[in-house]
Amino acid sequence: MSSQSYRERTLVSVIGDDDTVTGMLLAGTGQVNENGDKNFFIITQKTTDEQIAEAFDDYTTKRKDIAIVLINQFAAERIRDRIENHVQAFPAVLEIPSKDDPYDPEKDSILRRVRKIIGE
């Protein structure tokens, strides 16, 4: 990937519950591009794993303006295979806690990779 394409990645996207996404939008991360594509995806009780995976794939492979994907850890667990298979530097995928589900560092794929590298 050229350095020019890295410069085009300026957005943070979020996949999560209503409270997490609302907080990120209030922080100013929300964006809708000229095609009507949003950089956020709200998970409800009716959201399927396939819909979460589709949003993740959109943000990590199709969109070239996303630099960071924040995903609630409970959602990452639902698409763990895709999270584990994402090895590109950009966009970076970071698992974050939600209001109802505490963060478990043992489930975080990035921390597991770091521990493997440093030999823990």
Swiss-Prot record:
Molecular-function GO term, any one: proton-transporting ATPase activity, rotational mechanism
Keywords from the UniProt entry: Hydrogen ion transport, Ion transport, Membrane, Transport, Vacuole
Location within or outside the cell: Vacuole membrane
Membrane-related topology note: Peripheral membrane protein
Listed InterPro entries: ATPase_V1-cplx_f_g_su, ATPase_V1-cplx_fsu_euk, ATPase_V1_fsu_sf
Cross-referenced Pfam families: ATP-synt_F
Function of the molecule: Subunit of the V1 complex of vacuolar(H+)-ATPase (V-ATPase), a multisubunit enzyme composed of a peripheral complex (V1) that hydrolyzes ATP and a membrane integral complex (V0) that translocates protons. V-ATPase is responsible for acidifying and maintaining the pH of intracellular compartments.
NCBIfam families noted in UniProt: V_ATP_synt_F
Name of the protein this chain belongs to: V-type proton ATPase subunit F
The species this protein was found in: Schizosaccharomyces pombe (strain 972 / ATCC 24843)
Gene coding for it: vma7
